[in-house]
Amino acid sequence: MHITKLNLVNYRNFKNVKLHFHKGINTVIGENASGKTNLFRAMRLLLDNSMPRSSTKLSEDDFCRSLGPWKGHWIIISCEFSDISSDEASQSLFLHGNGNIDGESEVVTKATYNLIFRPKAHIRQALSILPPGDATALEECLSDVSIEDYETVLTGKSTANFADPEEYKSIVGDFDAIVFPSELNNPAVGVRLPYILNMPNEVSFTFIKALRDVVSDFHNNRTNPLLTLLKNKSGEISPEDFQPIAELIGTLNENIEGLPDVCDIRDDITSTVGDTVGDTYSPNSISIRSSLTDDSDQLFQSLKLFVAESNDVHEGAIHEMSLGGANLLYLTLKLLEFKYQKANQSIANFLLIEEPEAHIHTHIQKSLFDNINYDNTQIIYSTHSSHISEVSNIKNMNIIGVVEGNCEVFQPATGLSDPQCGFVQRYLDAIRSNLLFARSVILVEGDAEEILIPVLFKKVTGLSLDEMGISLVNIRSTGFENIAMLFSDERIKKRCSIITDLDDTFFDTTIRNTDSVPLKKKKKKAQGSKESGQSRKTALDTFCTGNQWLKPFYADHTFEVDFIKSSNSSYLKKIVNDVYVDPATRVTAKGELSNADIAISGVRALTMANHQGKGWFAITLGNAINFKVVIPKYIFEAIKFAHGEFKPELVLKVLSHRYQRIVEHVAEGTMNMRAAEAAGNLVLKTKWETYLAPYETGIEIFSPKWEAFDLLIDDIDDIKAEFIADFPTENNHFLERI
C-alpha cells in the first residue's frame, strides 16, 4: 500500500493544493519557507502515532493566512491510498472504515483517510439558515465563534474532490455569495470513523527531521533503531538455540557470586547487621547475586553499536561519530527496520525524511538517493539540494512554489511522455536542476550569455539574479523546447524567459563575382544563419503562443554584435590588448571598434570573441565593464519578464546603487584630473573638467532630493524621474522600464 494523493485545504500556507505520490521514492522540492515542514506535519497528523492525540486539535494559527477571516471555514487534510494488500488484516480495516470496493470483486484497492477540522454542528446549523447574500447576518453569526467551537473528525470512504473550489463551496459554503448547505453532514465528506479504527496504529511511520538529535535516539530504548532490529531478530531465535547461551549466563552468574571477595563482603554484611541490631532483628539470610539476564530480549537491549567511519580504523560509540555519519547510520537502520518487518506486522511502511542534506555530504547525498530502493517502503523526502534533485525521478517529484502570493504544488512530469521525461531527467544535472528551485528561469544558448548576463545586471542595478530569485540556465544549444516544456499551467507555473540569437546579417551578404573564395563562404554562411534564425524564431514563437509562463527574446544578430550595437564599444576597446598580442592587430582592432558602421565594428567584436573563445572572451569582458555599461534591450526585457513587477523597494535599491556609483565615479575622475594638472597636462585636465561637470551638477541638484526621500511617504516614480532628469548623460533608459 502507498499514498497516491494528498490534498491540503486551508492548512497553514496551503490554501488548496494536491500532491501526487508514487511507490518507492518521492521528492518534495521547495525553497526555504515554502511549506515543506508544514506538508510533513500534515501527513504526520494523519499517520504518525508518535504525535500526541491533542495535536489533531488545531488552532486558529493553523488556518491559511491568505484565506482571510478563518471563522466558519474548514481545514481539510485528505490522503488517498492505492495498492492495498489483499490480506485479511488490510481488507478488514479498509472494508469497514476507509476503503472503496473495486467493482464486483469486493476487494478494496483504494481508500481515503481524512482529517477535517470544522465548526461544530450548531455553528454549521446557524450558517445554513442565513439569508443568502446577507453579509451583516454572516458577520453577526460568526462574531462570537472561537476555536473552541471547532471539532476534529476523521473520515473514510470520501468521494469529494477537495481540490475543487466549487466542491468546497458546496460542502462548506460560499462565503462570498453567503450561501451555505442545509445538509450538515454531506456524504461526500465520507464516513466518520470510530476511534477503534486508528490508522496510525496500523502503519509503520517514521519521520526524520532535518536537525534530528540521532545520538539521543540511539540512547533511548523506545527510539533506538538498532534495538528495534534486534527485537525483530530475537523473536526468531528458537529456545533450543538460545539454551546454551542461557546456561553460560547461569554459570557466569554462579562464578561471579562465588568469588572469594564477594563471599567475604556478604559474610561481613551479615555479621555487621547482627552486631548492630542483634540476632532477633537481623535478616534470616543475605546474598549477593549477579543479575546478568538470561532473557533474550533484555540481552539484546544490552548490545551497542560501534562504528569505524570511512576515514578511521577506530571503532567508536555512536556519540563519537560525526553528525553526518550518525544521521546516515540512523537512516540506513530505519530502512533496514522496514526491510525486516514481519508479515502483517503493519499494513504499510512510510518514511519521511526532512532535508537529508542538512548533515550529509553532497557525494553521499547523490549516492544514497540514487541507490536507495525498498519495495515495501514508501519514502518521501523534502530537499532544497540540487545534488539530491539531480538523481531524483522527475515523475515522482512535487515542487512547491509561489504563484501570485499563494503556495501551489507542481508536478513537472504531468502530461509528458516517457521519452520526454527521460530527456529532462538526463539533462537536470546538479547545476541545471537549480531551475526547479528558482522562482523564475532564464534559458540561454551559450557561454557568453551565461557568464555576462549576471555580470551586466549586477553592475548596472546592484542586484544579483540570485537575489531576484532567477536561475539562469545554459542549454548549450538552441533546443530550448525540451526544457521549456516544463513551464506551463499543467506543470511548473513559473515564468521562463528564453534568450536566443536571430543571427540576422549585419554586413552586406550579396555574393559578387569579384569576391574571394573565403569571402563568398563567409557571406553564404551568414545567409544560412539568417534563414536558420528566422525558422527558429517562427518555431519558438509558435511553441510559446498561448503559454503565459513562457516568452522568447531575441538578439537581432549575436550577443557580441548586439552588445557593441548598444553603445558599448568602449569596453571592447579596453580589452583589445588582452585579446591580441600583435601591436598592428591591436591598432587595427581599436580602429574598427570605433567605427560607427556595425558592419565593421560588429565583425571585429565577433572576431575577437572567436579568437579568444567565447567563454574566455566573456570572462575578459566581464572584468572590464562597470556601472555605465548598457544592457542590450532584449536581455533586460527577458529579465523583467522572468522577475515580473519591480517593487518600489527594489527600484530604490537600484537608484541607491547607481547614485553611489556616480559619486564614486566623480571622486575617481577628480583624482585623475588633479593628477593631470600636477603633471602639467592641461589638455587632459580640461577634458576631465568638461566630462565631470554634468555629473557634479547632477549630484548637487539630486543629493538634497535623495536625502529627503522617504519610501513610506513619497512616490518611487517621482524620485526615479528626478534621477533620470538630473543625470542626463547616464544610460538610464532601463529605469523607465521598471
Which residues does each PLM region occupy?
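Charged C-terminal transducer/switch regions of large nucleotide-driven machines
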Residues: W74-I76, E80-D83, F117, L138, ...
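Extended helical coiled-coil dimerization/tether regions that scaffold
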Residues: A210-L329, L333-N349, F507-D508
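Switch/communication elements of ASCE P-loop NTPase nucleotide-binding domains
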Residues: M1-D48, L305-S433, E450-I451, K458, ...
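Conserved catalytic network of the ASCE P-loop NTPase/AAA+ motor domain
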Residues: E31, G68-H73, S85, S105-V108, ...
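Acidic, divalent-metal-binding catalytic cores of TOPRIM
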Residues: N398-I738
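Electropositive, glycine-dotted interaction segments
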Residues: L93-K233
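Conserved P-loop NTP-binding catalytic core
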Residues: F40-T109
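Switch/connector loops and helix/strand junctions flanking conserved nucleotide-binding motifs
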Residues: S85-Q91, I123-L127, V215-H219, S389-V391, ...
